[in-house]
Structure formats: structure tokens, C-alpha cells
Design a protein with these regions (language model features):
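Hydrophobic/aromatic beta-strand elements that line small-molecule binding cavities or substrate pockets
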Residues: 114-116, 120-130, 139, 248-255, ...
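Extended amphipathic alpha-helical segments with heptad-repeat/coiled-coil character used for oligomerization
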Residues: 130-176
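A short, structured loop/turn motif at beta-sheet edges
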Residues: 90-94, 128-134, 252-260, 292-297
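Generic short beta-strand segments
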Residues: 97-106, 141-144, 227-237, 263-271
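Short helix-loop boundary/capping segments
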Residues: 188-248
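Amphipathic/hydrophobic helical signal segments and adjacent flexible N-terminal regions
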Residues: 27-91, 104-109, 114-116, 134-137, ...
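Bacterial N-terminal signal peptides that target proteins for export
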Residues: 2-10
Length: 376
């Protein structure tokens, strides 16, 4: 497939900010078009509160006209609680138009000035990597299209995005403790009964956060709400902020007939040298809406995932071994000035072969990851 001119995320390295600098001057939408928030801080200078993030909307897409098989299966009568939980998780798979909105709603410090809100978007296919009785893994792949300067469609850009794993009644979790450190935590059998742990991984498959919660199935929607957890700053924040150290918050995933929604309720937290909370700057609300679409060309993402699936499967396995064997992990952002995601994306690109040597690849991945592990 080398003849194809589809671009992959290794070429742009913007990832969590969803190509903001790449598209900010796109002709798809006027930069002067109003962009609104409900919690808009109306007495603040409008220039200061102009949303940052991607201002383009990309190529037009068509929303799915019906709820589809996944929704029908989820709402079927006679299911056990666990069966319905599983169908709710699997309902997040498929083709979506995604929008991302984040805004600070409350400030807690003297002289507080609200930060500019964040908006962006994407077209994502969520692939089912694993579907087992007690474990489901979902991989997000972005396939983005923009109009070129002459109005013709440009080649799609492919970005391996985040991954979410779901395990039933999981008792071991590595939780974030600030300072790029994750520590093993355990739940009792009683605490884990009937609950699912969602593990969220970065684009390079390194851990981001893990949280336990319980699915609830209402008359016409299903939702999962997490316990409060710590998580590192996402790229949309650490690329522009250095005045706080961790997010403390909860997530809620809600499945609807037209797709699903992820809500975040975060506290932007300053930590002291010992990793304890010293100050909370603000509360942030976030909403990511995934609307099911139809008729979109996902071939670039399909082919990328097919070419690199073996490499990423080995990467997941190497990380799983670290998480199984180590009580504490400290992961550096960079090694010799190179971010981990950049190194891993380059390895994935160079490993696209039909006869991948799994043992050699495993050793190479382990050696690469070791460069980013802090032994101190």
C-alpha cells in the first residue's frame, strides 16, 4: 500500500490536540463564525475566551438514519445485567463524527481568570480488538479529511488515537499518583462485584488512567459512571499549561440511539513535592459526543490498522507484562528529546511487514520502552 498517499499520525504528531495547528486556517469555516458555550463567562473579554483547538469541521459527513443493530441488541428484553453491560460497551464501536468541548466552570483561587475553552472534532472509527466474556478492548482510529486550497478533497490523514479496555470485576489497577507515576491499587472482591474497570491508554499504548464503575440501564439509555480518579494532563492541556499537575475527576459514558457521549468532570490540581494536593485551581467540564455516521470512506484507517495491528498487539502485550510485574511505574515524557509516542509511531511504520518477527519485535519494543522508564 506504499503507493497510497494517505498520511498517518506519525507525520503530524499532534494527536491529543486533534491537529489544531494543522486546521486552524482551513477554508471549511470562517474564523469569524461565532463559537458558543453555555458556560461562556459572559462578562469576560470575548477575545480572551475565544475557544482554542481546531476551527475546521472537515469534509461533510452523513449521520446514520437509524439506531442500528448495536442499539437493538442492547435494548433487547431478557438479558442479564452482565450481558447488557457488555452490549453497552460494544455499542461504542463503529463509525463516528466526534466533537470535543472543554471549559472551566468554577475558579477556586484568588484572582482566578478562566482559561480559554477548548473545542475540536474528528471522524473516528472504533475497532473491536478483543471481545471476550470478561474483557473488551476498543481501539480508536481517526481518519480525517480536509478540503485543499482549490476546494478538492485532500488525501485522508490517519491517526492512531486512544484505546479503552473494559474488564469485568477487575481487582488490580494501576492508578496515577502525579509526577508521571502509576502505582498498583487493589479492590476487594466485594468492591469489584458487578463493576467494570475502564483502562484508558495513550496513543502509544502507555497507561493513562484506570477507573472502576457500574453500568446502569434506564428505559431508553445506558450509562457508566466512574469512581473519582487521578489522571495526567491530556495533550490539549500540557501543550499550553504548566501551572498544575493532575486532573482529579470522574467520567460518565452514556449510550444513546444515535451514538454515545463521554462526559468529564475534572479538578485542575496542583501537587506538592510529595505528590499531595496543595491547591485546586478550577473545575472543568468536558463533553465528547460520538455521533454515528454512514457512507464515510474508512479504507485508509482500515488499511493502516491491518498493516500495524501485529506491531500494536505486541506493544499491548509488553505493556501488560509491565503492569502485571511492577507495583510502581514512572514513565518519562521524552528520552533524548523524543516523545514516546513519536518513537513508537516510527517503530510501527517500520514494522509493516507480512512476516513480522514477533520475538525480535518484542525485544525491540521492550528496549525502547525501557528508555522511558525511570528506575529511581
Amino acid at each position: 500500500m506504499a503507493a497510497k498517499k494517505w498520511r498517518t499520525g506519525v507525520m503530524v504528531m499532534v494527536l491529543g490536540t486533534v491537529f489544531a495547528s494543522r486546521v486552524v486556517m482551513s477554508d471549511d469555516i470562517s474564523v469569524n463564525e461565532p463559537r458558543q458555550f453555555t458556560f461562556s463567562w459572559p462578562y469576560t473579554d470575548k477575545t480572551d475566551m475565544a475557544p482554542r483547538g481546531g476551527s475546521s469541521r472537515g469534509a461533510p459527513v452523513g449521520l446514520a438514519k437509524s439506531a442500528g443493530e448495536q442499539w437493538t441488541r442492547l435494548r433487547a428484553p431478557g438479558l442479564t445485567d452482565k450481558e447488557r453491560d457488555r452490549f453497552a460497551i460494544l455499542a461504542m464501536a463503529g463509525p463516528y463524527r466526534a466533537s470535543f468541548d472543554f471549559i472551566e466552570t468554577i475558579g477556586f483561587v484568588e484572582g482566578y481568570i478562566p482559561a480559554a475553552p477548548y473545542q475540536s472534532w474528528g471522524t473516528e472509527f472504533v475497532y473491536v480488538v478483543t471481545d471476550e466474556s470478561d474483557f473488551i478492548s476498543l481501539q480508536h482510529i481517526m481518519v480525517l479529511r480536509f478540503d485543499s486550497s482549490d476546494g478538492t478533497p485532500a488525501e485522508p490523514m490517519v491517526i492512531k488515537h486512544w484505546r479503552q479496555d473494559w474488564r469485568y470485576e477487575q481487582r488490580r489497577m494501576h492508578t496515577f499518583h502525579g509526577n508521571l507515576t502509576w502505582k498498583l491499587a487493589k479492590q476487594s472482591r466485594a468492591e469489584s462485584r458487578g463493576r467494570w474497570v475502564q483502562s484508558v491508554y495513550q496513543v502509544d499504548d502507555s497507561p493513562r488512567y484506570m477507573a472502576a464503575g457500574r453500568w446502569q440501564h434506564r428505559a431508553n439509555f445506558s450509562s457508566w459512571t466512574s469512581d473519582e480518579t487521578w489522571r495526567p494532563l491530556p495533550r490539549r492541556e500540557f501543550s499550553v499549561r504548566n501551572d498544575y499537575d493532575a486532573l482529579i475527576g470522574t467520567n460518565r459514558h452514556t449510550i444513546t440511539p444515535s451514538g454515545w457521549v463521554q462526559e468529564e468532570f475534572n479538578l485542575k490540581t496542583v501537587l506538592d513535592d510529595e505528590g499531595a494536593v496543595s491547591e485546586i485551581l478550577a473545575r472543568e467540564n468536558g463533553v465528547a459526543r460520538y455521533e454515528r455516521i454512514s457512507g464515510y470512506d474508512w479504507r485508509a484507517g482500515d488499511e493502516y490498522w491491518k498493516r500495524t495491528a501485529d506491531f500494536w498487539a505486541i506493544t499491548r502485550d509488553v505493556w501488560a507484562n509491565y503492569l502485571q510485574d511492577e507495583h510502581t511505574l514512572r514513565i518519562r515524557k521524552t528520552a533524548e528529546g523524543i516523545p514516546l509516542y513519536a518513537a513508537m509511531f516510527e517503530m510501527a511504520e517500520s514494522s509493516q511487514t507480512a512476516n513480522l518477527d514477533s520475538n525480535a519485535t518484542r525485544d525491540a519494543i521492550r528496549q525502547m520502552l525501557q528508555r522511558y522508564m525511570d528506575e529511581s
